[in-house]
Amino acid sequence: MSSLIRRLNSLRQDLWRAARGQGQKATVQHYAQATGRRQPPPQPVALATTAMRVTAVTHETPSAISLTLVRQDGADIEFLPGMFFTLVLNIAGREHRRAYSISSAATLRTSATITIKRVPDGLVSQHLVDTVAVGASLNVLGPAGAFTLRPQAGRQRELLLIGGGSGITPLMAILRSVLAIEADSRITLFYANRRRDEIIFADELDALVRQYRPRLRLLHVLEEAPAAWSGACGRLDVEQCTRLLTQAYGEDLPADLRVFQCGPAPMMEAVRTSLLAQGLAAEHLQQENFLPGRREQALANSVAQPLTIVAADGQRWQGYAAAGQSLLDAGLALQAPMNFSCTLGGCGRCRVRVLSGSVAMPGPHGLLPEEEEAGYALACIATASSPLTIAIAPPTPL
C-alpha cells in the first residue's frame, strides 16, 4: 500500500496547489456577493485526475455494465475492497462527477473494474452505459472510500454482506477478495432485487457458491418473484431481514459477526434496525450510501457568509463562503486542509462539526441521524446559512 499512500499524498499536494490558485478568485467572488451582485453558481474545485483506458465492457444485466480500467501510464492500481473511483466527465460542455465502486478483487494490480447501473433520468449513468466502448479514456479521482476491508492471509472472519440492487458492487469486491485471500473466513450474502433479470453478477455468484460452499452462502430476495422462485419474496424490510438472519444463523448471531451493507436508504435503515434488535453492536456494522450526483442546490444564503475553520491543533482559516458554495469548496479556497473523497455526500470523509452557526444540507446523504444531531455536516454538500464556525479533522490518508 506504500505506493498508494505516496500517490494519495501527491493528490493532496495537487489539492493545495489548486486551492492556492483559486484563493484570489474566491476573494473577488466573496466581495461581489457581499455587495449584492449576482454571481454564477460556484464550480467544483479542479483536482488532479488519473487518465484510465477501458479495456473491457461486460454487460451484467440489461441495465448494468462493468468497465475494466487500466492506467494510461501503465502503473499498477492499488486499492482496498470497498473503495470507489469518482469519474469526472464532460457531457455537453458541463462537468459531472459520479462515484462508482470497484467490483473486482484487490488481488489484481494491473486493472480495476467498476460496475454501473443505468439510473432512470440519470444523465451520467445513461451516457456511460450507452456510449462507453473499449478504448475509451476516462478521467478519475481515487481510489478512495472508508467502506473497506483489508484481507489478510490466515485470518478467520464471519462476514455478512447485505446488498440491494447495484449496492452489490463494493460487496462483490469484498467477497472476491476475502474468498481469494482468507481461506478460513466465511461469508453470507443477502442480495435484494426487484426482478430476477436485475440480479447483477447472477451467474458468477452461483458459480462462486458452488466453488466455495460451505464458506459462501447466498440468500436472494426478490420483490417480483417468478412462480418457480424458491428464494425469499418481497422487500428486504425489518421482518424479512429478521427471517433471513434466523435462516442463516439460528436464534443467535455469531459473536464475531461483522456486517457490510450497501443499497437503498430504506433498505439499509430496515436492516440496521433488525440487526441491532438481534444484538449486533453498532460498531460491527458498516454501510455505504449510494447517492445521486452532485446536486443542483437552491442557494441557502443569498449573500456571502463569514466562515471560520478550526483545525484540531488550533490553527484557523477565516474568510467567506459564497452563496450556494459548499463548505468544502470554500475551505479549499481558503487553503484549509479539508478531508474529502467522493464530493457527492456519500462517503462521509468530509465530515465536519458545526461549532456555531447553521448550515443547509440536502438529503439523502451519508450521515447517520445521531451524527446530524451531534452537529456534524458533510462539507461537500453543506452550505452556510449564517455566519459559521466549523471544526475539521486532521488530514489523513484515504
Language-model-detected regions and their locations in the chain:
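Residue-level marker of beta-strand positions
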Residues: F84, A136-S137, S326, A333, ...
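Short flanking/linker segments adjacent to small metal-binding domains or redox-active Cys/His motifs
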Residues: E224, A382-L398
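C-terminal accessory/binding modules appended to enzymatic or scaffolding proteins
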Residues: V303-N339
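FNR/FR-type flavoprotein reductase catalytic core
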Residues: M1-S10, H127-D313
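Local cysteine-cluster metal-coordination motifs and their immediate loop/turn environment
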Residues: A336-M361, P369-S386
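Ferredoxin-reductase
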Residues: G36-S137, L141, G154-E158, N193-R195, ...
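Short, surface-exposed secondary-structure boundary micro-motifs
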Residues: N90, P143-A144, L355-S358
